[in-house]
Amino acid sequence: MNKVFKIGLIGCGHIAETYFRAEKYFNNIKIIKCADINEKASKRCALNYGIKSTTVNEILKDKQIEIILNLTIPKAHYQISKKALINGKHVYSEKPLAINLNDGKKLLKISKKKKLYLGNAPDTFLGGGIQKSKELVEKNIIGNVKLGNAVFAFPGIQSYHPNPEPWFTKKEGGPVIDMGPYYITALVNLLGPAKKVTGTIIQGQKYRTIGIGPKKGKKFKVECPTTYLSTITFKNNSVIRLTLSFDVIAHQRNHIELYGEKGSMIVPDPNMFGGSVLTCNKLGDNWKEFKTTKMPLGRINIRTQSSRANETPTNANYRGVGLSEMAYSIENKRKHLCSGEISLHVLDIITSIMKAASSGKIQYINTLCVKPKKFSKLDIKKLLK
């Protein structure tokens, strides 16, 4: 029987709903208190989920809380996580780890000094889709991966989010900070650490119009680049072309394609947990499908659309498994999978892409991480209710 960790939630925005739902799937996490700088949001969250609303300072000082779940906006991630660590709490944060590399390094240093766990989303790479892809890559089904493409492109969230402005601000906005962590974390999981990046930016519309909610019809200024084109070279010499854009109305590209010496692979959406993996090993052959619907974290559990959790119908969403796996790792004194080291390396790649794009110069990645081990079925079953 796993220990149930008492969790304090800071940041009661839309994504919080997903972590409360995670309690239905995983047996070792329980959110008992919540806090937000917006007291109304905190009280509403507490009422909805039958927990206690409190202040940020009170939740950080609460001795019964063992893990702080940091769901604040990106620019607040560093300060909240730092305060939590200083107060002796383990931390699991939404992505990114911080909005600049130095702050990320500081968090990792504090966590190591105080012997605390620092975890970070995304945890989607633990799902059936990416784990099956990892299994096939490591079984050498397509041979050594030489190159590939990764694409996230859509017109932006302003049409369906009532408060889209933070996604377009100067320091924390743009597609690299928002969606980059999903794609880059998946690629690091499949190919290992990166060594250098290049980048180019495209500036889309100067103003966007909010399409829903009380501010519907209001225009706001775009302060950041809205398309990044990057090339990531990994330490194993694989080269991946990455496109991240808020300027594309529609496209028919696959999320990730890997091209090896013996074949090609289509990797499912790294922003979700399920999806089929496809491989082809001979020109003109049909693609072979590897379904993940019978895998523990690939089973379909979503039937309705929910932009709040980036969900699509007939898909799998088990967000929160990274938090659960970290809690299990704390109890069993082992290394967790959504680790601070991996998150810092991903942050290094993200900030380096932005620097490369603005400067026109190659940026070298200075952080290191170990490619995550496979998330075994046995370990998954230990966490599931």
What are these regions (language model features)?
Residues S93, L118-N120, N149, L242, ...:
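Hydrophobic residues in well-ordered beta-strands that form the structural core
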Residues G50-E58:
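Conserved SAM-binding strand-loop segment of SAM-dependent methyltransferases
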Residues L116, G143-L147, P166, K355-K385:
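C-terminal capping/lid region of NAD(P)-dependent oxidoreductase domains
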Residues M1-Y49:
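N-terminal Rossmann-like dinucleotide-binding module
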Residues E66-I67, I73-P74, Y78-F125, N140:
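Beta-strand-loop-alpha-helix segment that lines the small-molecule cofactor/substrate pocket
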Residues T124-K221, G360:
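Predominantly a Rossmann-like dinucleotide-binding segment in NAD(P)-dependent oxidoreductases
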